[in-house]
Amino acid sequence: MSGLANSRLKEERRNFRKSRPFGFVAKPATLPDGSQDLMRWKCVVPGKEGTLFEGGVFAMTMVFDSDYPQSPPKCSFDLIDGKPLCHPNVYPSGKICLSIINPQGSDGGTWTPSTQIKVILLAIQTLLDEKEVNPLSPAQTDAYQLFTKDREAWRKRVREQVARVTPGGATGSASGGSGGPGGPIVLE
């Protein structure tokens, strides 16, 4: 890891801890030896109030390259019961399609090195709103087809997934109960 990436990620962690938006989590993953992996962060984005995603707690991962912050982190939602989040702008792998985390000149990317992790997470939360879906940039065929051809069926599927990732819901975790590779979701 470069010195710039290391110092920037440490600064991002300090800043996030000081001004963490309610319900959000962003912290380096824990390695088997107990140390922190600054290049891989486990995050939680709460569904925005007043949207279909309200009440959901969506686990995701941010992976940083050694040239961060020159390049954006790769952001992806954890799978929910082995399936991607039912959203037209989320790839089947869980990767999030959002201009703020795409390099400039790539797929309408608007990434700048000054973009903070907190801003990324808030933008991802905003994407979890039916009004913010970008049908011109479909990443997931099934979700796109439902969204454009049978909106009620799409809403039903979203509500089912939200129920799976709502604390106290069917599983209480975004990865089907186990919390995925990073363990259970723990809000700090």
Spell out what each predicted region is.
Residues 29-35, 48-52, 108-115:
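Conserved, non-catalytic sequence blocks in retroelement Pol enzymes and Pol-derived host proteins
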